Amino acid sequence: MIRKAENKDISGIMKLVKEAHSFSISRFVKLDSKTLRTNVQVCILSAEHFVVVAELEGKIEGVMIGVTHQLWYSRKKQATDLFFYVTEKGTGAGANLMRRFISWAKDNPGVKEIMLGTTSGIGDVERTKKLYERMGAVRIGDTFVLPQE
């Protein structure tokens, strides 16, 4: 079941973020649980954020977190993904999570652009790119990171 996240989901969302973080290019950046908990709660409560979960058999197996912000060159807004992850058990829920995000962004007043990325290196990036393209996204470039020690 895909549903809007609630405060009771924070621990489950944190578990997925920690799992995904261990696979990401940023895995050497220490994850701070207190900061993560606070930020997930803010996202759940904020009208400018979008948080939905995929729940299977009482467990959170996928999550999509997005946000809107004003474009730096316009009075219009952009919606972008902050975190998108589905466990092996939740495979297949990703498209539904993404559809909900896109629908939310399109219904959000002032949003003129939806930006999606595959910047963390988590999971099958090519599969995620294909999902984005099926949803109507157009590839516009690449992202590079300079890891710091």
Model-predicted regions and their roles:
Residues L82-G92:
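A short, internal acetyl-CoA/4′-phosphopantetheine-binding micro-motif in the GNAT/acyltransferase core
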Residues Q70-D81, I140:
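A conserved beta-turn-beta hairpin within the catalytic core of GNAT-like acetyltransferases
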Residues N96-E113:
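Conserved acyl-CoA
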Residues I114-T128, P147-Q148:
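Conserved beta-strand-loop-alpha-helix junction that forms the acyl-donor binding cleft
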Residues V53, K59-H69:
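Conserved beta-strand in the GNAT
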